[in-house]
């Protein structure tokens, strides 16, 4: 049986529209989970792994408040990319994005939907992100390309927290474009020379505990 070219065109057009709608629906589910958490405070243990410099494990306090206030408070130094520390950014799950459904993929024993997200805000630092989202709308993996901080990726582990907050996040990032806190005393010129001949990828593992959620966190915490 011969198929009419117009029929094939309409079929693929419909399929494309369905995939687009499905991607938006999945992001909407993530957004709904996200909006349940108005604020939180948590304890964090940060382990940074960089080939050419030894960095001790740090303890930190983490503060978050909607829509985009985020603070790591740690004594001394904790090397993290600015975007990597605040992965649930509004830039990725608000309505001002183009979302494209790619495929299904299994991470561990979790079936996820892979979505590419392009922020439409010209001022967004994020150019393109790929999200691996489970059927209960938790992000298990993220890869982002940014204008100013290179490329970073993150993998999330969860326990049974009622607000679907992660127990651990493992972030891989470009060491030369990471956020360096004020007061960091390492010789950056020497560090940059070493990084030119070695792997410039760093890894940070952040373990969270002691979440306090929706306590009415003051804006003063972020000043």
Q: Residue ranges of each PLM-predicted region?
A:
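Gly/Pro-enriched, hydrophobic low-complexity segments
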Residues: 111-220
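N-terminal secretory signal peptides that target proteins for export/translocation
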Residues: 1-2
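A short, amphipathic edge element
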Residues: 23-25, 91-101, 149-150, 202-206
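Sec-dependent N-terminal signal peptides
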Residues: 5-14
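N-terminal leader/targeting segments and the immediate start of mature chains
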Residues: 15-45, 49-51
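One face of beta-strands
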Residues: 40-46, 60-62, 68-76, 129, ...
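An acidic-aromatic
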Residues: 49-108
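Edge/loop elements at the starts and ends of beta-strands within beta-rich repeat scaffolds
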Residues: 33-40, 53, 108-110, 135, ...
């Amino acid at each position: 049986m011969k198929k009419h070219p117009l029929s094939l065109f309409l079929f693929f057009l419909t399929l494309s529209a369905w995939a687009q709608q499905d991607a938006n629906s999945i992001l909407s589910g993530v957004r709904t989970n996200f909006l349940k958490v108005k604020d939180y405070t948590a304890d964090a243990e940060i382990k940074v792994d960089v080939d050419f410099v030894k960095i001790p494990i740090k303890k930190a306090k983490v503060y978050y408040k909607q829509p985009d206030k985020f603070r790591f408070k740690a004594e001394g130094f904790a090397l993290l990319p600015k975007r990597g520390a605040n992965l649930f950014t509004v830039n990725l799950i608000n309505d001002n994005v183009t979302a494209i459904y790619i495929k299904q993929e299994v991470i561990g024993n979790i079936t996820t939907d892979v979505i590419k997200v392009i922020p439409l805000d010209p001022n967004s630092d994020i150019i393109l992100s790929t999200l691996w989202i489970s059927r209960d709308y938790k992000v298990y993996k993220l890869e982002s390309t940014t204008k100013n901080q290179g490329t970073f990726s993150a993998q999330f582990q969860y326990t049974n927290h009622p607000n679907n907050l992660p127990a651990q996040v493992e972030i891989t990032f470009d060491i030369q474009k990471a956020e360096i806190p004020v007061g960091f005393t390492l010789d950056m010129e020497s560090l940059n020379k070493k990084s030119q001949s070695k792997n410039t990828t760093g890894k940070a593992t952040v373990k969270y505990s002691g979440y306090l959620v929706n306590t009415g966190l003051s804006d003063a915490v972020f000043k």
